[in-house]
Amino acid sequence: MDSYNILVVEDDQDINRLLCKILEGGGYCCRPAFSGSEAVLWAEQYYYDLILLDLMLPGLTGEEFIEQMRRKKTMPIIVLSAKAGLEDRVNVLRLGADDFIPKPFDNAEVLARVEAQLRRYKQFSGGGGSAVLTHGDLTLDREGVTVTAAGKPVTVTAREFDILTLLMEHPKKVFTREQLYEQVWGGEYMGDDNTVNVHISNLRAKLAKASPAEYIKTVWGIGFKMSDL
């Protein structure tokens, strides 16, 4: 098993210790952080493959931490919080989180979701197939984990990169929300369109800042595909 480094950001020492124990039992290396400010320091000094994040933190909040990280980093961020209302979940996904686990959590589910995120992240950052995908003036580099539109760099999250990779691998195929969720998130689709819609919306907005071209087309009543060239 590859060795992955995970930053666990949780101000409750008992919960932080439990999460580290769960993850270390799965073979991961964990660094505990107990505030948003401390987490920023660790994230700037060292490389982490994934961040497990509480929202209600002293000082810098979880939401502020996500915003700060997404200015320059793309690793998966899983939010784990008691703030589990629909508005809260949609908000953190829009900010750039890749997944959300409500508290109280199930130990096995935490480990499974971490494994799924890292598996997908590893696949798109170094997976098979052509290293560079292009669609018009849109370019995606698997090895460099970069996206450019009209020659301009586009900063995307791990999940957004994964979605775009899948769409660009099959530019003629229309993907339903269920197909996108099951292939990108690696879990069973439960009929909630918000997760997929939010990530598609965020991805489109970022691409639009670099170029006015429409890259991702909505096929009404079905799903999404790459736009026709």
Segments (PLM) and residue ranges:
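Short helix-coil junctions and helix-kink-helix linkers
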Residues: 183-188
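Short, Lys/Arg-enriched segments at the junction into DNA-binding effector domains
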Residues: 4-5, 116-174, 178
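Flexible coil/turn residues that form the inter-helical turn or adjacent wing/linker of helix-turn-helix
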Residues: 44, 173, 189
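DNA-recognition element of transcription regulators
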Residues: 106-119, 155-165, 177, 190-209, ...
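Short, cationic-aromatic polyanion-contact patches
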Residues: 226-228
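Alpha-helical residues within the helix-turn-helix
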Residues: 41, 182, 205
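Pre-signature/interface helix of ABC/ABC-like ATPase nucleotide-binding domains
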Residues: 67, 131, 152-154, 182, ...
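N-terminal/domain-start alpha-helical segments
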Residues: 1-125
